[in-house]
Structures are given as C-alpha cells and as structure tokens.
Amino acid sequence: MAAPDLASGGFARAERRLLRVDPLLPWPLPEAPHCGAPLGTGDEAGAAALGRCEHWAAEPGSLDPSWGAARRFQLIPTIAGPDVAAGLGQLLAQWRDHLAAVPGSGADDTAAIVAWPSRDADGVLTLLRHGFDPLEVLAVRTAPRRRAPAPLTPEPLPRERGDGDGTLRVRRALMPDADLVARLAIEVIRFDSRFGAVNERPDTLAALRREAAGLLAGPEPWAWLAERDGEPVGLLAAQRPEAAHWIAPMVGQAPAAYLMLMFVDPAERGSGTGGRLVAEFHREADAAGVAVTLLHYEQLNQLSVPFWSRHGYRPLWTTWQATPASAIR
C-alpha cells in the first residue's frame, strides 16, 4: 500500500508520543540521507506507522566497513497509531517483503538495522519476534546545569620514560602520536568485534591511521593519551560539534559533540584511568558550551554499560539488527 500521510493529526500524535517517551529525542525524526523505498501502514483511525528504507554500501577503504556490515538497510520508524506493537509489526513485515525483492539482501555481509528509541519499551517484543537483536546503543550525556565550568587543569610537563614513580599522566595527543592513536584504537575495534556489530577489516588499521592524522591535524585536538611510567595505557578521541554534524540529528539538543572511542589497557581497568580521560574530555566539552555529548557502545559489552552509566551517559537510541538483511521474520 502507499505510505500513509502523517500530515495534520498524525504527525502531532507521533510527536507527542515520542517526546513523552524521551524528551531528548529529535523531532521530526532524521530523514534517510540516501534514497530508499517509502513504507507505511494505516488503519481506520489514520496513519499507524511509516518509515523509509535506507540502502547503502560501506565505502571501501574508509572506516565505515568496520562499524557494521558491508551493505546495510536501515529503517527509522515513525509510529502515529495508538497500537505501537501492531503498527511496528506491520511496518516490519512490509519491510521484510520489500527486502525480499532486493538483489543481494540475503548475502552474508548484509544487515537490516532498525534505530529504535531506547526508552520505548512498546516496540521491544515486536522487534524480537521479527528476528532483530539489540546490538548497539547511542548514549547521551547532558552538560551539567551549574555555575561556569571549572578551568581546565594544566597538563603536567612530560616526564622521562622509566622514571618509575607509577604516576598516571594525561596529556593531549598531537600529530606525532597519530600512529600510536591508530594502534590503540584498533584494540577497541578488536574487542568490540566480539559483540556482533563491529568488524575488523583488512584495511581497518590503515583507515584508522588516516582518521587519526585528520583528527590530530588541527589545533588542540579533542584527543588525550594516558601514560604510566612513560608507557601509553589509555586513549580517548572525540569530535567537536562542527565535526559531529553527522550524528547531531539523532538528538534534540545542540550543540552536540561525539566521543569516538576510548581505550584502556586491560591491566589498568579499575585504576581510574578511564575516569581521568573522560573527566578531561568533559571539562573541555563543558567549557566549550557543548549541550550534549554522544557515544556508541556495544549493548553486550559487559564493561561499557556500567562504565558509561557511572559517567553520566544513558541510552538514547538502540540499534536492532538482523543478519543477513533477509533474516527479518
């Protein structure tokens, strides 16, 4: 059937419902940036659900193939009818039938992805019944509402390697650190690849080197290294709002920064190293007037979920995935 019209009352109902679920969600929902098929279901009461199937292939040689399947089909549903489970179920069934006619949707390195608000419990059972698994979370932290942010702590002077006092030092990463940043970053990808959404590809390290060089090329990059006795034990890298424009439409406040990744050496876990890195980033982001910071973590990562919760992040969107894309039930 043709996609229903959400004009007039349908859009208003959808907006009211969404903002009741989570006031940090954006409205209207992000449009698919690539062309795709419009989908929709309706009932006697008017529009129940609609979405647009976004098709795209990860760009070879970039970091994009490391963050998911080589070919992806994504849906961000808008639910306007009173029965969320029924509307979503009909939309997913229509999407399944659409993908069945798309050549290659059953190939191994494909995925069907639904972005669903994390606080919206009404769709969870429907997604599970249609063959989707919750794999990734986009989490959000809002800047504290208080007096002006405390000034940044001056960075300590470099110490000689091997001074042996065991002191943890956090410093800004600079261009000469680009290769080190890439080598630490790939450890994050290797660890997260255990949880189903992230993949190390043959050219991932080369792509990370290019990404690190670009990040560190500017003045005062948002990247920090933690060192103990002169040895690197941690890394945090983030994008300022002007570079985080690709993810900013997923949240209803601005400006938004994006925490790209954080690595802590396994021997350092529980020592406060990760907390020091996060505090450095938060102080700088808050001082710059950033309203919200966003990050992704793997839903099944037993370390990420409690760590980021302790540091003020909570789920905003959950990525549900069926692999291959034809696996939707």
Protein language model features and the residues they cover:
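Conserved GNAT-fold acetyl-CoA-binding loop/helix
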Residues: 2-33, 192-211
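Acyl-donor-binding surface of acyltransferase catalytic domains
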Residues: 79-153, 164-165, 318-324
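A short beta-loop-alpha structural element at the N-terminal edge
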Residues: 1-12, 169-184
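Conserved hydrophobic beta-strand within the GNAT/NAT acetyltransferase core sheet
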Residues: 114-115, 259, 293-297
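Conserved acetyl-CoA-binding loop-helix of GNAT-fold acetyltransferases
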Residues: 84-101, 261-264, 270-283, 287, ...
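Conserved donor-binding loop and adjoining core beta-sheet/short helix segment
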Residues: 26-98, 233-255
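A conserved beta-strand-loop-helix scaffold within acyl/acetyltransferase catalytic domains
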Residues: 53-58, 197-201, 205, 210, ...
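Conserved active-site alpha-helix within GNAT-family acetyltransferase domains
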Residues: 118-134, 275, 288, 299-317
